[in-house]
Regions:
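A short, N-terminal "cap"/entry segment at the start of jelly-roll beta-barrel domains
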Residues: 1-31, 116-141
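A generic "binding-loop/recognition-motif" signal
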Residues: 18, 40, 51, 70, ...
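Conserved short histidine dyad/triad with adjacent acidic residue
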Residues: 34-49
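A short hydrophobic beta-strand segment most commonly corresponding to one strand
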Residues: 35, 55, 81, 96-112
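Short beta-strand His + acidic residue motifs that chelate non-heme Fe in jelly-roll/DSBH
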Residues: 45-47, 65-66, 82, 88-95
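Glycine- and acidic-residue-biased ligand/ion/polar-headgroup-sensing regions
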Residues: 51-53, 58-63, 68
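Structural motif
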Residues: 62-64, 71, 87, 98
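Short acidic-glycine-tyrosine-enriched beta hairpin
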Residues: 69-84
Length: 141
């Protein structure tokens, strides 16, 4: 059994937003759970994933969510599903509050070695570098 309080996760920043790693891929081999806080008026960079799907659980705030060519406004509490190989991004539409959601990434066939090489911190450092090359803010890794 694995139980962790949100306060026990490890915080990090990426593309101007704050995250807390709760359940790293290193410990599961098949999934990952991360809290994400999007600053007022902020967005996540557009991205997609070849080998995993994601579930977003919104619990505070309002967002515009783009998934696979469709945009929808979402008010917490709400849930969204992002299939593999589908471009997606999230925008906090509120100017005075953070958007809070939990995303759960699931690899149905297990996490490929190249997506866990060096541990989750190394994987996210590569993601941050990728976003920086596209002009998104560079944060501490």
């Amino acid at each position: 059994m694995f139980i962790r309080q949100f306060s026990e996760g490890e915080p990090f920043r990426c593309a101007g937003n704050e995250f807390v790693m709760l359940l790293p891929r290193d410990e599961t081999g098949a999934c990952e759970a991360v809290l994400q806080m999007v600053r007022p008026g902020g967005t996540t960079p557009p991205n997609s994933h070849e080998t995993f799907m994601q579930i977003y659980l919104f619990w505070a705030g309002e967002a515009r969510v783009y998934i696979g060519g469709e945009m929808q406004r979402v008010r917490a509490p709400a849930v969204a599903f992002v299939p593999p190989r589908t471009e997606h991004w999230v925008e906090n539409v509120l100017a005075d509050r953070e958007l809070h959601y939990l995303y759960i990434s699931v690899w149905p066939d297990g996490i490929p070695p190249e997506e866990r090489e060096g541990g989750w911190k190394n994987v996210y450092a590569k993601i941050i570098d990728s976003y920086a090359s596209r002009g998104y803010p560079v944060d501490a890794k």
